[in-house]
Structure formats: structure tokens, C-alpha cells
């Protein structure tokens, strides 16, 4: 089974969760394409990645799309979370921008949404998780990746 992401943090998490399966990265499957995330939902992007990678590999694929939706920012960055400051920004730069935008805002409610899609050429299985919380006012901790620090 292939995990359709080049994100090493996500790959580690998927391997930990599905430890009984042999999960290959895109690189290990010799797939060197980046599927454009141009859909208007997390589910749409995950489904697109799963089906596109399946067409290349002809073996089962797990794909995800995830992001944060901040209430005070009208749900932004939402489905564009990884790209809302441009393609070449780091997680630290994105986190700093979020802290800057929320600097004087009391309502710091956020939902981290993750959609997983499994596709084997016939069957589509979908899962969604939503973690609710608040954006901190400063960086905290050093473990994890992505938005874990805020």
C-alpha cells in the first residue's frame, strides 16, 4: 500500500497507525509526481491524490488532505493551509503568520481537519477527523510538525 504524501511527519504517523501493513512512501514506490491540490474540500483533494497515484502504481493507496480552519479568520486558511503563503514557505513561517493575524484577537478557536481516503481501484473508504482547540499566543513545545507548536 502506498501513502500518497512526501511529508515525512505524516508518513511516520500513518505507519504508526497502520503498523500491521507495509506502507510505502511515494519515493519507495518510485513515484515522483506531485498531485495538484486544486479541489475545494479536504475530501476532494484526498480523493484526487488517491485516484491519481493509483493510476500510476496500480496498487492500493491511502491519501490525505488536512488543514486548519480558524473561526476568527472566516475558516481560513482551510483547504489552502499548506499553500496560503505560497508554495515555498516553511511551517514555521505559516505558524508565525497565523500568530501575527491573531495577535489582537481573543477568539482563537480552530479546527484541525484531516480526511483520509483509501482507494484500491474499486473501493473508496473515507475517514474524517476533527480536532478542536485554540491557537496559542506563542510557540509551545518542540515536538511534532506542522501546527503542533501553536
Labelled PLM ranges:
Residues 1-2, 8-150:
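Anionic-ligand binding patches
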Amino acid at each position: 500500500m502506498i501513502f500518497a504524501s512526501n511529508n515525512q511527519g505524516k508518513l511516520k504517523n500513518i505507519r504508526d497507525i497502520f503498523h500491521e501493513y507495509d506502507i510505502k512512501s511515494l519515493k519507495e514506490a518510485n513515484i515522483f509526481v506531485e498531485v495538484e491540490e486544486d479541489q475545494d474540500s479536504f475530501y476532494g483533494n484526498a480523493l484526487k491524490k488517491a485516484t491519481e497515484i493509483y493510476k500510476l502504481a496500480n496498487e492500493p493507496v491511502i491519501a490525505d488532505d488536512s488543514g486548519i480552519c480558524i473561526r476568527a479568520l472566516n475558516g481560513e486558511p482551510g483547504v489552502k493551509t499548506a499553500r496560503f503563503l505560497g508554495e515555498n514557505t516553511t511551517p514555521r513561517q505559516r505558524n508565525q503568520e497565523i500568530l501575527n493575524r491573531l495577535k489582537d484577537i481573543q477568539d482563537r478557536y480552530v479546527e484541525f481537519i484531516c480526511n483520509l481516503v483509501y482507494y484500491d481501484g474499486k473501493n473508496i473508504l473515507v475517514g474524517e477527523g476533527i480536532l478542536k482547540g485554540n491557537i496559542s499566543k506563542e510557540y509551545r513545545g518542540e515536538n511534532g510538525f506542522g501546527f503542533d507548536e501553536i
